[in-house]
Amino acid sequence: MSEPTKAPAASAGSRAATKKELPEHFKAYKHVWVFIEQERGQVHPVSWELMGAGRKLADKLKVELAAIVLGPDDEATQHAAAEAFSYGADLTYVVADPLLTDYRNEAYTKALTDVVNTYKPEILLLGATTLGRDLAGSVATTLLTGLTADCTELDVDADGSLAATRPTFGGSLLCTIYTLNYRPQMATVRPRVMPMPEREEKPIGRIITHPLGMVEDDIVTKILSFLPDRDSAKSNLAYADVVVAGGLGLGSPENFQLVRQLAGVLGAEYGCSRPLVQKGWVTSDRQIGQTGKTIRPKLYIAAGISGAIQHRVGVEGADMIVAINTDKNAPIFDFAHVGIVTDAIRLLPALTEAFRARLSPHSRDRIAS
């Protein structure tokens, strides 16, 4: 079976050779924090996914889990702060200021680093989104600490250090990285890598507010206008319940339309493997895998996809994987729940017609919801 090899984690003894005694001021750093990403009043779902992961880390360390919310002083920011308790937060830190209405690196970096320096978290987690990646890098640089990006697994070892695992060497190796001598220990995680925790209605707990300590003249970046994305065809691939995807085994861009047709009948999103994006058959926002989207659908149908390691890491969280491939030895059959050895070009139209005959439009909506 072809799967990424996990490099053996360094033993406590081998890490001791590189681990210095933590400076006295770092010993005061406790608790796990999750940055709650919101834009225009909408919280990115990866924030709640990270709350679930953060809750597990905090429980292992026997410390508190805190959310950190930055935004304008409005109802949406206060709602995000309160909602964090429903996803496991013990307390929430809030920096609310008109200067934080739209994301600007200078203001957000100042706000987050000030709160970190004041309240001293041991672990700080952010989503590996466009905003999160930009912010995490500048915050880690400002704090002079380490950052592990695009993690696929988070844990704490026997010493209580964050063990952040991520793919490396083109996805052929999983490497566990430690920040041994600095605090906070920072990591980013892509959307849908971690499962969404169950939301539980809970009373609002402690909310601690902190001032921004910045004025408009301190910020080089200026917001001239805001133009919302009006691309109605933009994919919601990462959060779709049903996904149909195609790979090189389909042979041509014309045959890829068979994937789109089946997805349309099922009320599903469609995606592809990396080679199709490289060939220009499909746009990059539809790519699934290590360098594309990570998905966790209830049903994933993969047609003509070999299932290389880089693709596997993006789909193995799916509840049900149905693989269609002419090669019975294709790696995708090692992790698919259902494998069909046949030509996808012949099977896809038959599936489309069968589902079209059996499913009313109402039924298709129900499958995709």
From Swiss-Prot:
One GO term of the biological process aspect: nitrogen fixation
Residue positions binding FAD: 299-327
Swiss-Prot/TrEMBL keywords: Electron transport, FAD, Flavoprotein, Nitrogen fixation, Transport
PROSITE patterns: ETF_ALPHA
Pfam families, A to Z: ETF (PF01012), ETF_alpha (PF00766)
Any one GO molecular-function label of the UniProt entry: flavin adenine dinucleotide binding
Subunit structure: FixA and FixB form a heterodimer.
Family note: Belongs to the ETF alpha-subunit/FixB family.
Purpose of the protein: May play a role in a redox process involved in nitrogen fixation.
Name recorded for this polypeptide: Protein FixB
Taxonomic classification: Bacteria, Pseudomonadati, Pseudomonadota, Alphaproteobacteria, Hyphomicrobiales
